[in-house]
């Protein structure tokens, strides 16, 4: 029997992903990334499946390997806002906040029609993750302030509003 074509392998990996079998899909996309290394979607789905498999299903997928797969997808197809957004969200989930901020800002610059959504998503996800990760700072307003300030800066960007305008409304 002839070996499946790359298209068929991608379809099978997508089916596993659609069925919620992220471990199986991750394994398939990992193999596909080695077979067709110039396919941005394969790298993106490798990253996404690695993220879901490790996050929700406890698979042992290295954080750096997931980050590298997102970066490779972006390198191969740097016009996909969703690649930057997903990468940024993943970086937040692993407490790589500077990298996340950079990814969200690049995505917002690429597609101004989505900038408000991207900035507000970064602000909320960033703040929620910091509060969940460093719960003890919630009790101390001074410790919480720098994180709240950064989140607020991005919310104001999303609203296209200066701090002065916001103060006048409050």
For the regions a language model picked out, list residue spans one by one:
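Canonical tetratricopeptide repeat
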Residues: 45-46, 86, 121
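Residue-level recognition of tetratricopeptide repeat
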Residues: 14, 48, 55, 89, ...
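TPR alpha-solenoid repeat register
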Residues: 42, 83, 116-118, 167-168
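Alpha-helical segment of the N-proximal tetratricopeptide repeat
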Residues: 4-38, 48-61
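Short coil turns that delineate tetratricopeptide repeat
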Residues: 37, 78, 112-113, 160-164
């Amino acid at each position: 029997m002839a070996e499946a074509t790359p298209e068929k392998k991608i379809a099978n990996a997508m089916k596993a992903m659609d069925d919620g079998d992220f471990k199986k899909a991750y394994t398939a996309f990992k193999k596909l990334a080695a077979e067709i290394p110039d396919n941005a979607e394969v790298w993106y789905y490798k990253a996404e499946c690695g993220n879901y498999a490790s996050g929700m299903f406890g698979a042992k997928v290295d954080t750096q390997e997931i980050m590298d797969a997102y970066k490779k997808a972006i390198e191969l197809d740097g016009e996909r806002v969703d690649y930057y957004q997903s990468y940024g969200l993943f970086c937040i989930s692993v407490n790589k906040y500077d990298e996340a901020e950079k990814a969200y800002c690049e995505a917002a610059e690429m597609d101004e029609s989505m900038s408000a959504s991207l900035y507000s998503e970064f602000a909320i996800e960033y703040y929620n993750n910091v509060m969940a990760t460093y719960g003890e700072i919630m009790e101390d307003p001074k410790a919480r302030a720098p994180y709240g300030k950064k989140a607020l800066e991005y919310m104001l960007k999303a609203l296209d509003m200066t701090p002065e305008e916001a103060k006048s409304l409050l």
